[in-house]
Amino acid sequence: MWNVSKSSNNLGAYKLPLEAQTPPEKISPFDAMSAAQPEGKAPHDQLQNDQYPIQQAEDRGRHLVEQAEIQAHVQHCHSKAPEIGDATKTQSVSEKLGTAKNSSCDASQILIGSKNDDFHKNKAGSNGDINKSSDPSALRCSLSPAPRRVPKSKKSYGAATIGGKVYHPHEKTDSTIADFLSRSLSNNAYRSERHLRKRALAYLNHISAEKEITSNACFAMKDVNSFAHKQSEWLCHLERSLWRDEPALQFHDRQQLGNEVLGLKKPDDQSPYFKPRAWKISDEAASAFAMMLKGESGPFTQDQVKVGFEICQEGELLAGRLKIQPRMAFRLKNRHDANRSGTHSVKSLSGLDLSADVGTDIREFFQVPVMSGTSGTSSDVVIAARYAAMHAGLKWSAPELTIDQAKHALIDLSMDFFRRNGPAVVMALRMNSLRKNQGLPYKEVDRCEVFTHSYAEIHGAISLTIDGVDPADKVEVKNRLYGYTLDAKATLMKIADRSIRRGVRSKVDIRSTSTSLQTPQLRRVLEKKKIVQKVAELYSEMGKAGNSATLKEAITKSSVKELLVNDKPVVSRDYALGEPLMVRSLRFSHDHEATSSFGSAGKTPAKREVDTLCDNSTAFDIVMTPFSVINAKAKGDTISEMKVPHRPKWKGLPSVLYKVTASVDLPEYAVARPGFGDIHSFNSNKAFSSEFSSVRNSLSHAEKMGFIENSLKPYIKHDPDRESFDFKHSIDELADAQCMLQSRKPNSTLRHNEYCAKLELWDAKAIEVGMSRPVAVATLIEFNLEMLSAARYIEDEGYDGKLITNFLERQLSWFGQNAALNKEVTLKKLWGLPFDERKAVAEKVCEALRQGVSLCVYEKNVEGSRIRELSLLNFNAYDIMRGIELFLSSKLLQPPTGAGPTVKSRL
């Protein structure tokens, strides 16, 4: 995306004074905003004619740094009592900034664009010749004091725009968003706060792995035997082969052009370098490219062979300015870039807009970091290598490397270039200039956290170009990016896992280290813990309420209101219209737990139900979740209402009502819950025999259900009024049979029936209160908390995560309502599922999870039964308080008190 060149000794760009920054209105647009450039215009041609702004700033910054370094040295050597706050006591300014060439990898904590007011205040006094006097006091008089540490200012955040307006974090902002915006420097547009959080979490989950990739790439360039070093050197030789006999140079003085690249000669109006650059080419790249233009065939130096990536960019630039048509046409035909809708992070006050970019869509799907979209510059370098190799009759990959090794070497070179060198410096400078007009303060961040390109964006661009995918074939590009992004995510996950197992302990920044070691799972646990803390705070506030009105006001104003109040009467309406519902009664782990404390066995009934639905059991393979079917034309008991046998473990507990919501946006298989059942209950647990255990791993979900059904046929209960001695195979069919049985027994309440299928957590719609309203309140809170957590899990892990993948595998194992596909065929269908289809399913699942559950009562009447929706706000104060207390008692280390302090969570 960014066609920028790293600068050796680029001190001014590292810590540039504010007055030297380029105003926003003069910021030159980068070329890569469009997928293809106009004919004859290379990337750098899109920049405006601002004469060497960064080079001038570098000179000024270098002068100020040298002045400050002298001051620091003198004060350190001659001051009798140096102050503790002296920033130069242990490390010089030049050491902080990494003045040595090619030493970026040794300065991982450099802050980009940091400002030091002492540099501006102390410009005078450094012009005198310090060698004229050996008197230390004279020296101290002629020099101003050494720069001191600048006091920390108010925390600044990266620019994020929602609806064209800059988003400002506040005390209620999600910690994930606040952490992301505080540690990174970016200017991107988002659809909503939830969209911002999704991108933020992907960034936080993988930034440590990306930093490790970048660091490894940097160190690889020090090893002449590394793949990256060999490929970089080969790029230099390939590029030189193109310019040795280039016909376009016949009309130009090659010596003059070489000197212009080196900055030794001023370009005339006929020179391709007449139009000034917006940045300075690095000394190593300039010297190497000047050799090529002059036709010199001497060997490259050790420093020159390290900048092959930059040299290829320079070759693309000059080819465009010289209008070398074959090379320009090859670039246009093969270049891959992002669709940024004409926006740019250093130009657009409303932020970089990637909403129309297919690559970004896929990266969000897999929850990997998004920065600026597919890297056009990375694609350019591959194009340059392929074009040169084609003309020279050589391979584009280094002789000793395989294609795969060369590809990963290019990815490393690109990561090192974008995240440690020129692009990070220039982007930080220009985004900070733009921040003035956005009403945001100057911001300093670690260079690796300036938004240039993420690993997946670079990986995708290089892979697409190497594999020769036609940029005009949008379907093929999309399909390939799907696979490339999956590979990139696997790499990031592998590195993160390895880092955690190593137990990385940084000596520099404990805070960033502890944050980097937080896995997505741990981060979700911490988020859940914070929500429990907020419920505890609400409980304390409610304990201070003087009346029910004040208590309800505290609930409605609470940040956890959504966990308690859900007034969407969809269940009662649909039930009255004749749609059957599925019911599962909650239960304790055993009868004794029902008489002891709530959740004393380690899980509450609600958590046990959630874990069953999500197949979180480590001891069992949850193939099915048996339930009862109820409908408005019949009156049947739930399991919690059973009188014989009397089991305290489920007696009077709430029940969960389930309903699969059809949607025109979803394929039929996603809303089907194939299974079998009967009007009478049967011993469904009898199916899990040793025989089933021996074959289950080789069976698809549908095959498992078929095996279970055949095993349970002997347990179908005898009934003289039965039409068939076989199972029903649809919920509607069982509901019809229930109505027929009710018609034969109009005055009787039917015993619960049983249906075996696999319900999902997002099928849950309501909590039937049962005999205890406080228990119902506790169940409501926990169920909604777990559903919210599940939605975040899916969004955090990406739509290829375990929960969605397992669901799709189960659903795709069915062919129609009853036919089963084997495991091999099922997996082929799963991995052949179109990206858009998988995404649509996952988004609908998350939407259903975020809707949560409401409270209701299941009532029987003369005509049958009905569902009556309830609101928590209609409960009395005691039931609400006691219910919240029950919930907290299962989550907290100390029992809560009505007006007591917030206590620690044991989640």
Swiss-Prot record:
Region (Disordered): 1-47, 116-157
Sorted UniProt keywords: Virulence
Highest taxon in the source lineage: Bacteria
Coiled coil regions, renumbered to chain: none
Bias kind Polar residues: ranges: 1-11, 124-136
Protein name (record): Avirulence protein A
Species of origin: Pseudomonas savastanoi pv. glycinea
